[in-house]
Design a protein with these regions (language model features):
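A conserved pocket-lining segment of Rossmann-fold NAD(P)-dependent short-chain dehydrogenase/reductase
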Residues: 173-194
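Active-site "gating" loop of Rossmann-like NAD(P)-dependent oxidoreductase/epimerase domains
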Residues: 108-132, 147-148
Length: 300
């Protein structure tokens, strides 16, 4: 298939590009400049320079694809509008061209705190974390565009680890810098997680199977934040030393994202087997040493 990936050099996007190219697909990554376009060659993909805020820079390219995967996002007010513009542009291109599948990247924060009962794809998004309060409307834009010709899917990844690290890299970084992995609050909140390689395979499965609707990309393990920090500390050679940062102190430094980072979530999926996917990586606690080695290699 001919597949366009936005955010193609990002943490998730680059993994998706590499997975799709390795599987024999003709992948084009939408990037912001020529330097990033050149990076994609190492992943077996082509680069195309465009700006999500400028529909004319990628609309025709998108219309000529078999599938579109939107992973790009800029965490800012302008980024929210750019995301909405991108969705509208990609959908219009899909309807005007040959596109058969469109996949949108959301996240589990739209579900808010879930409590102890596993939360599946049909759960409400009425109480999302405030920082992503806009996102359920963007999910709906994608989902209502589904038709017999166009399969639309929303992927909600858990906390991603592996490779260059994502959020988990901050625990490795603080362990190295301060001698203890720092986390926010009491650490009893649970994190649904997924290795970046498993997530890339997940996207490939959704595209190849023309998945429709909402999918939770999680490995089935809800791990307490304090345990994640301790495992990161041990992997970083700090003997499991951790330090809790009070929520109020973290909010003063980091803003509203803190309330998303301390969500207590138990997320599950009833749909992964529909697309023939299961995680190959055990879980973060069992793979912290490997994840740290990957992070160090990517940071070198």
């Amino acid at each position: 298939m001919r597949i366009l990936v936005t955010g193609a050099t990002g943490y998730i996007g680059s993994a998706v590009v590499g997975e799709l190219a390795a599987a024999g697909h003709e992948v084009t990554g939408l990037v912001r400049d020529e330097e990033k376009a050149r990076r994609l060659a190492a992943l077996g993909a082509q680069g195309a320079v465009g700006n999500l805020r400028e529909p004319g820079s990628y609309r025709d390219l998108a219309a000529g694809q078999d599938a579109l995967i939107h992973t790009a996002f800029e965490p800012s007010a302008e980024g929210v509008q750019a995301d909405r513009t991108a969705i509208g542009t990609l959908l219009a291109a899909a309807l005007a061209g040959r596109v058969r599948t469109l996949v949108y990247t959301s996240g589990i924060w739209v579900l808010g705190t879930t409590g102890d009962t596993p939360t599946f794809e049909d759960a409400t998004t009425e109480h999302p974390a405030a920082i992503v309060a806009w996102r359920p409307a963007h999910e709906k834009m994608v989902l209502v565009a589904e038709s017999s010709q166009l399969a639309t899917a929303v992927v909600r990844p858990g906390v991603v680890y592996g490779g260059r690290g994502g959020l988990i890299g901050s625990y490795f970084r603080s362990a190295e810098k301060h001698g203890a992995a720092e986390y926010i609050g009491n650490g009893r909140n649970r994190l649904p997680m997924i290795h970046v390689e498993d997530l890339a395979r997940f996207y490939r499965a959704v595209v190849e199977q023309r998945g429709r609707g909402i999918f939770h990309a999680v490995d089935g393990n809800a791990v307490q934040l304090a345990d994640v920090a301790q495992a990161a500390s041990e992997a970083a050679g700090q003997g499991g030393a951790v330090r809790s940062i009070p929520v109020a102190e973290a909010r003063a430094k980091m803003g509203p994202v803190v309330d998303a980072l301390i969500l207590d979530q138990v997320i599950a999926s009833r749909r992964n087997l529909e697309i023939g996917w299961r995680p190959l990586h055990e879980n973060f606690l069992g793979e912290a040493d490997r994840a740290y080695a990957e992070w160090k290699a990517a940071s070198a």
